Amino acid sequence: MRVPSRRPRRSSRRGSLALLLLLTLTLGACASAPPAPPLPPNVEAERLRLEDAWQSFGDLRSLAEIAIRQRGRSQRFNGALLLKRPASLRFEALSPFGPPLLVVAARPEQVTIWEVPAGRAYLLPSTPDANRRWLGLALPTEDLVALLAGHVRPLRAPRSGTLLPADEVGPSVRLSGDEGTQRTWLDPAGRPLKVEWTEGKNPMRVTFTRPASDPATGGSVPRAIALVTLDGRLEVSVTYRDPAVDTGFDPALVTLDVPQGVEIQDFR
């Protein structure tokens, strides 16, 4: 008596396994997070207004006084600041006499920090993690440039949003998503007065002090900016003098070529 061949059963088993795998993948895809619902129209309008204001910014040049207090250590610099959208900046901290004390230049692909008296320079990638090393905040360079220009980049891919009634600062828009929660207070012209991030990588608050009127900038540039992390470990204040916006300066001005003879530490 012949024993029936088991090959058809194996084929059937393989087919069942394939079907089970396909079903598992299909169910897994169905179980993924659904797309976020659209924001309420009034919230989306405010989000777009913030984004459009940032996109309309070109450049800024100004004398600046920058004070930094981090974990009990204080530093103060006076110098010249250049900003160019989307992610370029240059700051030269000037000494009363002689060469600059410090030069920081950031581009979309690289950050260069040159400690002039020490004859040392550091090259870092222009990433949030690298910016944490010198700035103390894991901010994208584009977000840093936006804040220094008096703008706020609205939270990317928000999953919910709310317009909040005015408090002692003004009305505000709150956006929440995977990056945390961002709340931005606005003046009657829709310009940010204060922004606060919570529940993300950089819980902090930034306050903009805007002039009542400024014919040179149309009030788009704040007179002063104060940044503080919510844990109090970092405080930064920036005060501008004679700012000028959208002058169309040469982009080469924000680049920094470290001269020969300077010790370079490359962390890229």
Residue spans of the language-model regions?
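Scaffold/interface architecture of coatomer-like assemblies
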Residues: 149-151
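Edge/loop elements at the starts and ends of beta-strands within beta-rich repeat scaffolds
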Residues: 53-60, 72-75, 82-87, 213-219
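Gly/Pro-enriched, hydrophobic low-complexity segments
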Residues: 160-268
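A mature extracytoplasmic/lumenal domain signature
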Residues: 66, 85-87, 93-97, 108-110, ...
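Sec-dependent bacterial lipoprotein signal peptides
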Residues: 1-30
